[in-house]
């Protein structure tokens, strides 16, 4: 489906100063400017009742949402929930009859080289189909310049352009395996999609409770890369571990502190899985529900020590 939105752009500080200047010197009452901003994107119906999956950046802050179906019907939509961290949103339309819904697949079994098709409305051209392959997997948000994001994207060379955001990425069986989300401006053949497994989990929470519950551990960490090890050595810091994830700081009264994690500990395993960088630890935390326990194995001054941390609900942007 194609999604069109309208939002009100608030008055800028420059606009306010100009308005105050006119009112002061001319005695005229000036109404604050309310500029309507229009945008568009794509989405796909995941339930015959009119539940639609799209990107958060398409509908966030929208005062009006209109959904254009493939049969040219235009229906008003309402936003059920938005998660800016993963860029996933859920929109609902009320249709007089059941709507055709897509078949959701799985992204965990994807492999580079698989053939995929991207659907959407790039630059306003509805029902556009482009094809390509899965170029790579697990591209972290930070690599795309999305500092606050927590997504390991699917990379594809299927053409994705502005307006494709929120549209489905489909495999050869017609199953949705990703949601088209991002491009790198000026680059050719670099498109990115949110794995459908993540989108399904986030959308389920948004539909049920309107928000996403995230686990909180309470540490600041850094990957023990060769560059980090060299920098530590120059500062006179000696570690018994040469690989893993260094705990730099443990936040006061956090689950990590209560469990006994300490600055200087090096995380080498989460559960039974060895970890080599901070992204792997972060992903493990992301997959954990608040109140569940995460089993860490840390290297503490040469001794492998198991520490179990009972997570709490995240109330800020800590890890």
Where do the PLM segments sit?
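Conserved amphipathic alpha-helical interaction elements at protein-protein interfaces in regulatory
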Residues: 269-270, 287
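Conserved catalytic motifs of ABC-family nucleotide-binding domains
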Residues: 264
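Short, positively charged, low-complexity/disordered linker segments
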Residues: 259, 267-268
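Short strand-turn-strand beta-turns centered on an Asx-Gly dipeptide
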Residues: 70, 270-275
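Serine-dependent protease modules
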Residues: 2-243, 248-252, 259, 278-282, ...
């Amino acid at each position: 489906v194609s999604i069109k939105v309208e939002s009100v752009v608030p008055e800028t500080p420059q606009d306010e100063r100009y308005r105050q200047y006119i009112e002061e010197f001319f005695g005229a009452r000036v109404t604050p400017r309310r500029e309507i901003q229009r945008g568009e994107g794509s989405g796909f119906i995941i339930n015959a009742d009119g539940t639609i999956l799209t990107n958060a950046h398409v509908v966030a802050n929208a005062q009006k949402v209109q959904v254009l179906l493939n049969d040219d019907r235009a229906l008003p939509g309402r936003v059920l929930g938005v998660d800016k961290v993963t860029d996933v949103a859920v929109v609902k339309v009320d249709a007089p009859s059941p709507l055709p819904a897509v078949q959701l697949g799985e992204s965990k079994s994807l492999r580079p080289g698989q053939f995929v098709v991207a659907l959407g409305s790039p630059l306003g051209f509805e029902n556009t189909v482009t094809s390509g392959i899965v170029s790579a997997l697990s591209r972290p948000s930070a690599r795309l310049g999305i500092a606050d994001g927590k997504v390991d994207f699917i990379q594809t060379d299927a053409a994705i352009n502005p307006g494709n955001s929120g549209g489905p990425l489909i495999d050869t069986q017609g199953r949705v395996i990703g949601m088209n989300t991002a491009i790198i401006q000026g680059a050719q053949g670099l498109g990115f999609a949110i794995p459908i497994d993540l989108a399904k989990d986030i959308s389920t929470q948004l539909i049920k409770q309107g928000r996403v519950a995230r686990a909180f551990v309470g540490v600041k960490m850094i990957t023990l890369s060769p560059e980090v090890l060299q920098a530590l050595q120059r500062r006179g810091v000696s570690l018994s571990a040469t690989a893993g994830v260094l705990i730099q700081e443990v936040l006061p009264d956090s689950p990590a502190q209560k469990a006994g994690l300490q600055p200087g500990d090096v995380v080498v395993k989460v559960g039974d899985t060895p970890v080599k960088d901070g992204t792997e630890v972060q992903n493990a935390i992301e997959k954990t529900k608040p109140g569940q326990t995460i089993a860490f194995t840390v290297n503490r001054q040469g001794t492998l020590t198991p520490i179990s941390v009972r997570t709490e609900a995240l109330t800020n942007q800590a890890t």
